Amino acid sequence: MILTLTMNPAVDIGYTVETLKMDTVNRTQKVSKTPGGKGLNVSRVLKQLGSPVLATGLLGGHIGAFIKEKLDEVALENNFYPIQSETRNCIAILHEGLQTEILEAGPTITPEEQAGFLAHFETLLKEVDLITISGSLPSGMDEALYATIIEKATAVGVPVLLDTSGKTLKIALEASTKPALIKPNQEELAGLLGVPEATTV
């Protein structure tokens, strides 16, 4: 089984309007609300391909309950660790061929919740053959958390695929135990190497 980690999931809300007008009311008949986050996108694709997959991460509040409900509706197996703070929304407004996004920062995780999640993860680790880690960490979490997860998984022979960026990625790559694979885009790779992003004409 493949375990997917989404530590900072969201409800992706899409609003479609013909024209986005500033400083006034905009009305829409087209609204979509779906569980979001890179790891959940990975989970959906794996399920479509027929691979056994288990989604985990952090969920809290009414928004977290909505995400779990929607995953259960499509029989996407999940076992998230509960937190006190509310899971975030990410809003996309589609207008005039453009997309304007409003991204909430997300919850702040306590040290006790981080420790609880790691214990939860170690329980799930006994059931899986491969782990994917996708996306950012929420506020309050140790930036070395992914490195810790990679170390714990590798110690029991479970490879980890890592898709993140910034300092979290740098710490994971500088740790003694490395991920089996990383997936940086051009901008992330340039930042990791400390060089200007390449451009094409």
Region locations from a protein language model:
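Glycine-rich phosphate/adenosyl-contacting loop at the front of the ribokinase-like
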Residues: M1-T56, G64-F66
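General beta-strand structural signal in soluble alpha/beta enzymes
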Residues: L5-M7, F80, T132-I133, V160-T164, ...
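Conserved N-terminal subdomain of the carbohydrate kinase-like
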Residues: T24, Q48-V128
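Short, hinge-like loop/turn segments at secondary-structure boundaries
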Residues: K21-M22, D72-V74, E96-L98, S176-I182, ...
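Cofactor-binding loop segments of dinucleotide-utilizing enzymes, especially the Rossmann-like FAD-
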Residues: L5-P9, L58-G61, I83, S136, ...
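Conserved phosphate/ATP/ADP-binding segment of small-molecule kinases
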Residues: A147-V201
